[in-house]
Amino acid sequence: MEEEMMILGVDGGSTKTLAIVFDERSERIMGVGISGPSNFTNAPRETAESNISDAVRKACSEAGTDLDGIGIRVFGLAGIGDSREATELGKDIVRSIVGHADVYSDGLGAYKFANLNDDGVVFAPGTGSVGFIKNGSDPERFGGWGWFIGDEASASWMAKQAILFAEREHDGIAETGFLDVVRRYFGMDLYETVYAISKEKIAKRVVAALAPQVSAMARSGNRYAISIFEESSSYIADLLNAKSRIFGRSGKYSVLGGTMLAGDFYRDMIRKKSSVDVSIYYGYQVAIGDVLIGIEKKGSISVDLRNKMIDQLNSILENKKEDIKKFLFLDSVPTS
């Protein structure tokens, strides 16, 4: 394969790193690599480097190529844009692994994936949460205040709500059903858990990984778990409705992130409460946006091409059961 036809797109965040090698000539994803977190602002540089390198190596190996065979390399990393220092650190990490590359905020890839070049809003509730609005220029960020006070509707926020309900059950205020769930998940007394989290002895991504159990409880009818999703969906609808007034209800509105895997019940809540049409995607698909940025360096992109890549990625991931369970917390790839 000719070098100029190969594109590497990498999305790195607080929970996982996913790399895609795409052949522009055949319009096919040739390789996919998944590894652990690469948000260098809340993990050691060595961890971020190792996981980015691992994901890239896996994707290249599956594609039957190496970095010399890839002409365009686009990285979308959490932490880029947080500060000048963070941005330089992220770019330096990428250079140390692949040499020349275009490095952007993971939000730019997320926006490109969901809305392409249309004006509108993308809200991304994953491990944390952040939003982007585009109105005739480059997407601008909003939200993303961090998990101590902000990151509403994110997996870490949902996990914190679950711990709060566990505290209420512990204190005899309400039988929420969360106390045993939280104890089993963290493997320690509730007081010890709260102390460890407050002292940052338990990583944000580990706390956030409790969210799938909250989803399962909601699907089984636990009213306290359902209330978490009611509050979360109301927040998402409120922000979409508020931002839509800027566009006079026109524009494109998308929500993407791992929390969208909670189930149809949650996606339906968001759509019913929103006054605009909402497209919903999943966080593991965002690396496609980085590939689309690469394609635009020489050509054009379309919804049809994006959707074709989604189908290809889903098909490839179905054959990576161990990786999607370990890094994406999925037993299978969603079909809707």
Curated annotation (Swiss-Prot):
What is stated about the way this protein's activity is regulated?
A: Probably activated by phosphorylation and inhibited by dephosphorylation.
On subunit structure and binding partners, the annotation says: Homooctamer.
For this protein, the Enzyme Commission number is 2.7.1.45
The Swiss-Prot or TrEMBL record describes its family as follows: Belongs to the eukaryotic-type N-acetylglucosamine kinase family.
Give the protein name, as stated in the record: 2-dehydro-3-deoxygluconokinase
Family annotation (InterPro entries): ATPase_BadF, ATPase_NBD, Euk-type_GlcNAc_Kinase
Per the UniProt record, one Pfam family is: BcrAD_BadFG
Q: What Gene Ontology molecular-function terms does this entry list?
A: 2-dehydro-3-deoxygluconokinase activity; ATP binding
Q: What does this protein do?
A: Catalyzes the phosphorylation of 2-keto-3-deoxygluconate (KDG) to produce 2-keto-3-deoxy-6-phosphogluconate (KDPG). Is specific for KDG.
Q: Which domain of life is it from?
A: Archaea
Q: At which positions is ATP bound? A: T15, T127, A208
User: Which catalysed reactions does the entry list for this protein?
Assistant: 2-dehydro-3-deoxy-D-gluconate + ATP = 2-dehydro-3-deoxy-6-phospho-D-gluconate + ADP + H(+)
UniProt temperature dependence: Optimum temperature is 70 degrees Celsius.
Q: Which UniProt keywords apply?
A: ATP-binding, Kinase, Nucleotide-binding, Transferase
The organism named in the record is: Thermoplasma acidophilum (strain ATCC 25905 / DSM 1728 / JCM 9062 / NBRC 15155 / AMRC-C165)
The relationship between pH and activity is given as:
Optimum pH is 4.0-5.0.
